[in-house]
Amino acid sequence: MTDPSKNYVNGEWVTSETGETTEVTNPANPSEVVAAYQHSNENDAAAAVDAAVAAEDEWRNTPGPERGRILREAGTLLAQRKDELTEILTAEEGKARPEAAGEVQRAIDIFHYFSSKAADLGGTKKGASGPNTNLYTRQEPVGVAALITPWNYPIAIPAWKLAPALAAGNTVVLKPASIAPGVVIEIARALDEAGLPDGVLNVVTGPGSSVGSEFIGNEGTDLVSFTGSSQVGEMVYEQATDAGKRVQTELGGKNPTLVADSANPAEAADIVANGGFGTTGQSCTACSRAIVHEDVYDDFVAELVDRAESLDVGPGTDHEMGPQVSESELSSTLEYIDIAEAEGATLVAGGGVPEGEAVETGHFVEPTVFTDVDPDMRIAQEEVFGPVVAVIEVSDFDEGLAVANDVDYGLSASIVTDDHTEANRFVDEVEAGVVKVNDKTTGLELHVPFGGFKRSSSETWREQGDAGLDFYTIEKTVYDSY
């Protein structure tokens, strides 16, 4: 292990006031300490906010093309270090290497995408009702953005919050997840080398109870963007709104794939397996419910079980499905498996810890499939955040659609069908912010909005694409008479 990483505050790499650090271990081999990061407190977080406030005027008045140049250069530096970033991500979070490399590339693409937006922020010219008046609107930065990001996509999600925030002219304080902060530190390093002025970005590692809470409550921050669990996110939303902040939350999901009677069972099983077992099921858009028409139910289950049992589970460096990120996440998944069996669901694949030398020490769990699942069971209602798919049998499309909507979440949903009418009805009537036809629930394009319904997100603000800039800007209307 190298020396402990430092916080990035006001253009300097600094240690925490506490003098303490937190070790991060490899989820595939928990005895291996990968790195150590600052265990920061409220004062460290407050100092970061002070730096961001002090840098506001300089950054908001920096021409958009120059802001874009810095973002573009940072993206290029990240691209040059892609292999290194992939290794850090796999070592800290556990993702299979191809998944980690894909996530790093997404972060690179996000920086390049928003670099072009910095010089082209929205605004419109309107016709005035009287003579000798220019009437137009312009988008301006909101102020200091507090970003609190999760461990499951430790570079992509920080990138899709940070890049639009900076492009729009905001300054930023950022708290990455304590489990996997290494790639965020490297983003800060790239932006620093690209010429980002001091104080525009400040990264502080440490507990959410101290660093995150200070970011949210500090009077110097103007807006808060949080991605994480629904339970924590709802507390963040309440705290931030009570403090008068603009707030954006992206939270949990209980995402369905509806398999219609016209679907090819093998193709549907591929879609569900990719959506449910990819990234070890640790995605807010993972498919955790397969809602299957009775006519194709048996064939679909056989195909899905085959895919679950054939997945190569082991360290992300050289296996198809890596470990869960921590002992607590593994324990939670195993607890849900026990709950499902106790409630009467039938375990038809997986359900335990895999055996073998490659997996004997890590936080590994088998890809798991349950059948005979009632829609009211906890396994069909609550987010598991592991590679567990509950298969629910339905008699027709209308029943399947009703089951799909009968949860507290509404993030992503998909349908597998050859019936165009069914596909259109599903798009129209399913309660989800992301809807896919003949595709898995996971996987997003960076240039279109992302967000959910119900408990999955604060519906006012979307992330990514042009909509991703809206949260970080405020519109001003100008009447210029002459």
Curated annotation (Swiss-Prot):
A molecular-function term among this protein's GO annotations: 2,5-dioxovalerate dehydrogenase (NADP+) activity
* Biased amino acid composition, Low complexity: 11-25
Q: Which PROSITE patterns match?
A: ALDEHYDE_DEHYDR_CYS
Decide whether keyword Protein transport is in the record: no
Residues at the catalytic site: 284
Q: Which factors induce or repress this protein, as stated in its UniProt record?
A: Transcriptionally up-regulated by both L-arabinose and D-xylose via the pentose-specific regulator XacR. Expression is repressed by glucose.
Phenotype when inactivated? Impairs growth on D-xylose as sole energy and carbon substrate.
InterPro entries linked: Ald_DH/histidinol_DH, Ald_DH_C, Ald_DH_CS_CYS, Ald_DH_N, Aldehyde_DH_dom
What protein name is recorded for this chain? Alpha-ketoglutarate semialdehyde dehydrogenase
Q: Which organism is it from?
A: Haloferax volcanii (strain ATCC 29605 / DSM 3757 / JCM 8879 / NBRC 14742 / NCIMB 2012 / VKM B-1768 / DS2) (Halobacterium volcanii)
Q: Which gene encodes it?
A: xacF
